[in-house]
A protein has these predicted regions:
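N-terminal auxiliary segments of SAM/dcSAM-dependent transferases
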Residues: 2-64
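Class I SAM-dependent methyltransferase Rossmann-like catalytic core
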Residues: 11, 63-89, 93
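Conserved Class I S-adenosyl-L-methionine
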Residues: 18-19, 261-311
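Conserved alpha-helix/loop element of class I SAM-dependent methyltransferases that forms part
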Residues: 81-116
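Class I SAM-dependent methyltransferase SAM/SAH-binding core
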Residues: 119-180
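A short acidic, Gly/Pro-enriched loop at the edge of an enzyme's catalytic core
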Residues: 179-190
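A short glycine-rich, Lys/Arg-flanked "PGG" loop and its adjoining helix->strand segment in the class I
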Residues: 200-214
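Conserved class I S-adenosyl-L-methionine
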Residues: 212-244
Length: 311
């Protein structure tokens, strides 16, 4: 990538040869033209001075529930370490998948010489905490190939992507739609999709044959303490997580390789609990004033890490 000022680097990192990005309007290749991504049909997407580009068109596709405040509270929870075990599991799975990427590519004649470095996409990146941690992790491993991994992250929330892009770096941040991912077919080695909606048909399209999906979903005891408090207050019937639909959705498009469960319980003080309550979807449409929170002094974060391979 081109060196220079942060602004110039924030633009230059979107330059790929051959073209990586695909126009979401006409599906022609998007190439870097000064400070924009532009296709042959002149559809143009400007790159922000903060180092991200929005390829969304039309009205606001963002939910009012996922506003800037939501992502700022989520960032505070991540910074407190409540999700560190999930982040480690995610990074482990991505790193393991990248270790096999060169061998997988060598079996595909048309892609054998297409790219020197592996490519990872965080689909539904939010404010970018998982991708930032993955960026630091890959930069620290004793492997020149992994050090040069091409990192791309997108979310449908422009607010989230604006937060994610703060601080510069090599990650290519985009505001984009899962239903129309702006990447060309067969261009990605690994997709991370963490506590986020999925589009398995699109994932399969952009993954190379043998590419990997790391899908992370809540485990059965995820936020069990808070869910019990909600049930005890009579605001919901028993709240249970089932990942059967997720597994069926993945299996319809990919081959599931393995599933690992990670869990940790963290003590929470009043400030951390406030941040957590403001960022967990469990609290959507729940009146916090109706809850008895005086005895809620810990929260369990449990996740199932599902690794699947594109067929």
């Amino acid at each position: 990538m081109e060196s220079g000022t942060p602004v110039r680097h924030g633009i230059a990192k979107f330059n790929h040869d051959p073209a990586l990005y695909r126009c979401p309007l006409c599906r022609e290749a998007l190439t870097l033209d000064r400070s924009s991504l532009r296709c042959a049909n002149r559809h143009t997407f400007d790159i922000s001075s903060k180092g991200f580009v929005s390829v969304l068109r039309g009205g606001n596709n963002e939910s009012d529930l996922y506003d800037r405040s939501f992502f700022e509270h989520r960032s505070a929870v991540f910074s407190a370490g409540m999700y560190d075990h999930v982040i480690r599991a995610c990074c482990d799975s991505v790193e393991n998948s990248l270790a096999t990427a060169p061998q997988t590519r060598s079996l595909i004649p048309e892609s054998a010489n297409s790219f020197d470095a592996p490519r990872v996409v965080d689909a539904g990146c939010g404010e970018g905490h998982y991708m930032r941690r993955l960026e630091a992790r890959l930069a620290s491993v004793p492997s020149q190939t992994l050090n040069s991994t091409d990192l791309i992250a997108f979310d449908i929330s422009r607010e989230a992507v604006a937060l994610a892009s703060r601080g510069g770096g090599d990650v290519e941040w985009l505001a984009a739609d899962l239903a129309n991912i702006p990447l060309r077919d067969g261009s990605v080695d690994c997709i991370a999709n963490v506590f986020s909606p999925a589009n398995y048909a699109e994932f399969t399209r952009i993954l190379r044959p043998g590419g990997t999906l790391v899908k992370i979903v809540p485990g059965p005891h995820h936020v069990a303490e808070l869910r019990k408090t909600i049930v005890d207050a009579g605001l919901r019937k028993e709240l249970r997580y089932s990942n059967d639909d997720v597994l069926q959705g993945i299996s319809a498009h990919m081959r599931i390789l393995n599933t690992t469960r990670v869990s940790a319980t963290t003590a929470v003080d009043d400030a951390l609990l406030r941040d957590f309550m403001a960022m967990t979807p469990v609290m959507f449409h729940i009146d916090q004033q109706a809850l008895e929170l005086s005895e809620l002094d810990c929260i369990t974060i449990e996740a199932d890490v599902i690794v699947a391979s594109a067929m």
